[in-house]
Structures are given as C-alpha cells and as structure tokens.
C-alpha cells in the first residue's frame, strides 16, 4: 500500500510539474504558433503582441491582435482587437460534450472596404474562414463524431466598431461605434425541449451628422429545422440624407429627415409575424430633374404632390407615422419575406399619405371658407 501511495504521489507531482512547465512554455511558444495558424487560416499576416494559456482553467487569451488586409486594399488591418479570450470547459469532454464557456472580444475594429476596382475585402475574408473551417471539420471527423453535443455559453463583443469605406464613392462611407453584442447559450444539435435557447443582444451607435441608435434583443433557435424567434428591435435618430447613397435611385431624393423604428418579430414553426412602427421626423424631399412626363409615381402618387405636402405645407414640422405587418408561412414557396414587406410598406405609406393630404386640404378649405 505504501508503494502504491508513493507511486500515486509521484504521478500527481509529475503531472502537476508537467502542467506548470507547459504553462511557462506557453508564454514563449504560444504566440508564434497562433500567428502561424492564423496566417494559415486567413492567408494573410496575423500579428499578436502577447498570448497566454491557462491549462488549469482551460483558457486562452491574446492581446494586441491584428489581421492584415488583403493586397489591393488601403486599410492596414481588416480586423484588430485589444483582447481576445476563450474559456473552455475541458471536463465536458468526459461526457462527449464540447462546452465553450466564453468567447470575448474587447475593442475589436472591423474595417470593411470596397477598392477602386469594386472588390470587397470582407467577401474574401469570410470565405477563407468558411473554407478552412470546412476543411478542419473534414480533417477532424473522428473528433467531430466523438462529440455529440456542442455548447457555447456566451459569445460577447465589447466596445466594438465597424468601419465601411467605399473608395469609389465617399458618400457611402459608414461608421458604427460602441458596439455591444452577445449570444448566450448556443446549442448544437438543438434540444427539442428548448423552444428558444439562445439569447441575443445588440446595442450600437451609427456615427454621422446625427448619431443613430440601434437596439436589438430577444431569443432565437438558430439550428432548428423550423425557424423560431422572438425579437424586439428599435432604431432612433437615423438620418435619411446621410445614407442617401445606399438607397436605390429615386425621382425624389431625401434631403432631410430622421427615422424612428420599432420592430416586433415573432416566428413559431416557420409562421412569421413582424410588426413595424415607423415614425419619420422633419422629412423633406428634393424634386427630381426628370421631365414631368417621365417621372414615375412614388407610393402611387405624383412626386410633385409629395414634395408639396412635405416641403411646402408644414408637414415636416410634424411626424409622419404609420405601421404595417408582415405575415406569412416560411414553408410556402410562393412567400417571399422581402417582397411582401416592400409591398406592405408601399401600401401603408400610400394610405397614410392619402389620409393626411385629405386632412390638409379640408383644413385649407375651411380657412378659405
């Protein structure tokens, strides 16, 4: 018994010493290993200031992460982050589960760019990630089959920023700052007893002449065969004029106005119900330059009538409000969510314009009378 006890003690001490040695070695060898693997995955240089590994806690951290942009683009880095941390639950592997406690990005910066040739750096970047991920799954098929359950307890982005630059048209440049994003409890394969297992949260500020606020929160089931979600979203103070370059050409370009939007999106077993509440403030249009005979109807009305209503009759001082719903079955091959939403939006604007224009005309007639 004493011999077995001594052997056990020696084994434990040796195992702990091995972990400590590996812990110390990680500070010297982990950084170049991660840079090499990152370069292999993304096909561009990857730089890391510091990296560390905690064998006892099952955690990996990196500081000063930079992913170089592809050749042909002016932005230096496509992605950078002050800190990236990954925490694993290694004991979960004993039950054929692979649990990631947390993936955290602090101060990440994503620089999306369209160069003068019309090439988009984001397309190549994300395609490389998907391609290499598929190769890894195929190469590690034994490990993938051994694990029967995957759980991501939390994915979080703190104080993130996304910058979009179009070298062909500077009016399309866009910046989104102060991004807070999180996913909680992502499970694969999905548990049939959990209708909406994953919580979603997004809060961001859109920079520009006037700052807009975006908020999204709710719950989803991303891997279920039949879509289910319960999402609430809002947009406040988004400037129309600032994003005119992103909109389709119109005979009535918007020169002023802000958008306030609330959305409640529900879906259960592919039955979708999305309710929109829209409030447009200080809306003004610029008359198109096309001859009158060539100007198409806008929202089913003559463009000059809309310009007169918003620009000349004091309508911009008041909010223009309307709401519309999108109902449908995602299993129906004839149902197109975007087409139905656009059709219902056009109808709602036309109906509200008709009501408000009629009210203005009646008020003007009473004044004259």
Show the residue positions of the predicted features.
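N-terminal type II signal-anchor transmembrane helix
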Residues: 1-43
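Low-complexity, intrinsically disordered
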Residues: 202-208
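Extracytoplasmic/periplasmic C-terminal soluble domains
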Residues: 195-199
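Short extracytoplasmic
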Residues: 44-68
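Short acidic/polar mixed-charge low-complexity motifs
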Residues: 44, 210-212
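Secondary-structure transition motifs
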Residues: 44, 64-189, 282-308, 328-347, ...
